[in-house]
Amino acid sequence: MARSPGRAYALLLLLICFNVGSGLHLQVLSTRNENKLLPKHPHLVRQKRAWITAPVALREGEDLSKKNPIAKIHSDLAEERGLKITYKYTGKGITEPPFGIFVFNKDTGELNVTSILDREETPFFLLTGYALDARGNNVEKPLELRIKVLDINDNEPVFTQDVFVGSVEELSAAHTLVMKINATDADEPNTLNSKISYRIVSLEPAYPPVFYLNKDTGEIYTTSVTLDREEHSSYTLTVEARDGNGEVTDKPVKQAQVQIRILDVNDNIPVVENKVLEGMVEENQVNVEVTRIKVFDADEIGSDNWLANFTFASGNEGGYFHIETDAQTNEGIVTLIKEVDYEEMKNLDFSVIVANKAAFHKSIRSKYKPTPIPIKVKVKNVKEGIHFKSSVISIYVSESMDRSSKGQIIGNFQAFDEDTGLPAHARYVKLEDRDNWISVDSVTSEIKLAKLPDFESRYVQNGTYTVKIVAISEDYPRKTITGTVLINVEDINDNCPTLIEPVQTICHDAEYVNVTAEDLDGHPNSGPFSFSVIDKPPGMAEKWKIARQESTSVLLQQSEKKLGRSEIQFLISDNQGFSCPEKQVLTLTVCECLHGSGCREAQHDSYVGLGPAAIALMILAFLLLLLVPLLLLMCHCGKGAKGFTPIPGTIEMLHPWNNEGAPPEDKVVPSFLPVDQGGSLVGRNGVGGMAKEATMKGSSSASIVKGQHEMSEMDGRWEEHRSLLSGRATQFTGATGAIMTTETTKTARATGASRDMAGAQAAAVALNEEFLRNYFTDKAASYTEEDENHTAKDCLLVYSQEETESLNASIGCCSFIEGELDDRFLDDLGLKFKTLAEVCLGQKIDINKEIEQRQKPATETSMNTASHSLCEQTMVNSENTYSSGSSFPVPKSLQEANAEKVTQEIVTERSVSSRQAQKVATPLPDPMASRNVIATETSYVTGSTMPPTTVILGPSQPQSLIVTERVYAPASTLVDQPYANEGTVVVTERVIQPHGGGSNPLEGTQHLQDVPYVMVRERESFLAPSSGVQPTLAMPNIAVGQNVTVTERVLAPASTLQSSYQIPTENSMTARNTTVSGAGVPGPLPDFGLEESGHSNSTITTSSTRVTKHSTVQHSYS
């Protein structure tokens, strides 16, 4: 088919357009000739619509802004078609990191560089150029642009390590490679800029030069100089690296350290310190050190080249010795590991060879020649102990022995002396015999049977019974040795086979029954057994058959499965044909099982009936019903009945407990404010019309205040502040002498007892209540005093009718068996116990006769204070504090100084006064003091000699009082008493008459007449060191800061007051009892003789609490 000419022309035109048509052209606008990599083109060359150009080359580290634009792309379609073409570049430096390296003009296609290039960071840039129309579509094929960064020598070599470490053996051959060092250069590889050259800068030690360095590879080799570790163990090299093939430039040069350690080789032969060695061992010793072999080696310490290796050359064929190396000291330790006997060998000679643990170096291997080292060991003879020739012996006995064999000798276990080989003098005892089969003769070691052997005993293991025996030598030091006796028991056939489980239960669907027997005898008198079923009752052997038999058991099978219980008799014989006389019976129950849960319980009909116990109880109940009418016949009926006879004296016998004292009586308390002659009233807390007295200064706790009398509670105890009465003021204090008001009633707890300090007029109105209160207070104080010397055996108690808490030690502890309680107060218990005394004595008691007997002189003391409280007429309350100086002479005892004054009945009252706020100083350890503390106490009383007949107590009778006593102690605070240290004691007595009589000094009791007045004493005592004054009161051993309470009570009845009791005029009564308690003082001191041995400068407190017919002085620490 012929083609048309028009188509041929169209094809030709298309070819022409393809060859001549527009394309994207790249033009490199500038190049550098010095690179010699890119040829210079005077014009663009077209190859099939694409411009092929060489890559662009730019040098690093230069300012390239003067060379912009470095490239340009252009499309011919812009002129041919008149299109608006925009150009774009992508790639590293523009759209990929690092950004901002290049910028382009989208209209002209020019590419500019904006920063200095770094080849080490980016050695090559690959960009892609695009020609885009207005819609962003490519109008030309994208064109690649390669930009290479040319390198410059801007980096120096850097070592990979600051310190290189290597090693080489000593005695190494020349040119031995030691190690290789390495450095890197960041410039372009395989160029002159990155070619590194190495060099050794220095070497320590510098001479001789033992290493050289390959400058191109960095390898270090040894020279021909021989390395010796014993001379230099290490070397240090300083090396440097330069690029440019070692060209010297002004760039800094990096250096590194190279440390080379010389390795040790076994090139030294060990040397022994001593050529001949000796040692000594005791016989019969083992694991003891004999000697040490000292070795020297010049090789590296601790290495195998240094450690010595010892071997026996000769003499140790018996294996007596062992040698090992001490890794710390490199010494050979020779140890005896096998006992030697002096009698057999007295000397041991052997030799050893010394080498190293590591093999010798080839350089000295031919020079080493082993030399034996002789060692001589002497055996020391010692006194040996005892021993058994054999530590274990065997004795054979039979189980068939009868009782006559007990005590039979079955063997002996003799110990021998190792030195002489003769039997030793020793004692033999059993160490272990669990079933006490034997006895051992302690002298001859003979072993006797103490119990018949039993093969079946649980202590027999495999037919052997074990006993251990200890032999103790008689010589000193004693030595012991232990031996073992094995008693082999010969078994006899004395046991027959028996069933292990004679009662069994199986389910009806079980095929077999396992029947097992046992025999306590051993082989051959036990298994295997023979089993046979005895046909009793007939047919049993057919019903139960033996299906399979083992050594000691059989499997029994039932021919007919039938529920119920069966008793199957067996004949079981042992291996010797011996069987038990009685047949072995197996009680077997075959039952129906429910799903494997066991047999179903058999159903039985329930039966309810009375048992024998129920019938017996019914008969017993019937008999009891018959017995009740018989008991009713014995009761009294009608007139014959009698009532209960009351027990006489039930009111006295059934004493109402927890009720102390008589019931209180309600009485009206009259006014206690008398009017004096001047019309002034006595205040509620004081006494009017008191004379002014000077106040005593010092450390005393007693304050004398003008016109005032009061009590206050300070620091847990009572302190009294009062003033002196003088002149006519005492005439208006009332018939009973009461100077305390009703509002000053307080409880003093310093003595440990409850004391009611009510006024004397209140006692006159409620006499019975006050009497009982005083009585129980005295008794409680006495019991408390005794309790302080004993450990408390009960706790503090509070009774229901007490006004305050109980004492420190309860009055329940009033009877200590081991104590020394003075029970003489039972001699006179007062009127309250008169009825009880008459009942006990069976006779009437005359009270007046008893009082007349009491008026006779007596020397023994009692506690009868409450029984005479009805006669109280004057109450004086005072409390003074004495401060002692630094030291005083040691006083005499109180009994010796005042024995003549105690001529009548003496009543002792004790109290304890404490002052908690005052710190108690620790007494100094002075055994004796150089001075004394003297306190003088004297009482003078007078009264009418007419026997009184009645008791009259009333407030209208004038009376006189004891007002005060003063004590001056030598102390630093008593500066206002210049005569306090003169060493004198002054006692001043004043008498105040009821009708205004003045007070005159008295010389003694001989001036007092039997007139109706009461002497009031004002005494001034000076506590001062005085050798000429006889003390009447010795102070206890007290320390600084402690207190001593002195209590004085004085009663003197006035003639105008009728009294039922009389104190004779010619007698003077003073009683003192001192109780010392506190640190360093155990308790009461007898005979009132208290000496001061501790530190002085103490405080003494004197207080008067109430008036009795006696005088009591009390001392106590606080």
Curated annotation (Swiss-Prot):
Annotated stretches, region: Disordered: 1068-1118
Tissue specificity statement from the Swiss-Prot or TrEMBL entry: Expressed in undifferentiated pluripotent stem cells, expression decreases during differentiation (at protein level). Expressed in hematopoietic stem cells and circulating endothelial progenitor cells, expression decreases upon increasing cell lineage commitment (at protein level). Expressed on common myeloid progenitors, pro-myelocytes, pro-erythrocytes and B-cell linage progenitors (at protein level). Expression in mature cell types in the bone marrow and mature leukocyte populations is absent.
Segments in the Cytoplasmic topological domain: 635-1118
UniProt-listed CDD domains: Cadherin_repeat
Domain of life: Eukaryota
Keyword field: Calcium, Cardiomyopathy, Cell adhesion, Cell junction, Cell membrane, Cleavage on pair of basic residues, Cytoplasm, Disease variant, Glycoprotein, Lipoprotein, Membrane, Metal-binding, Palmitate, Phosphoprotein, Repeat, Signal, Transmembrane, Transmembrane helix
Glycosylation: residue positions: 112, 182, 309, 462, 514
Sites of Phosphoserine modification: 680, 700, 703, 723, 726, 806, 810, 815, 1118
Topology within the bilayer: Single-pass type I membrane protein
Pfam families: Cadherin
Protein name: Desmoglein-2
Protein species of origin: Homo sapiens
Encoding gene per record: DSG2
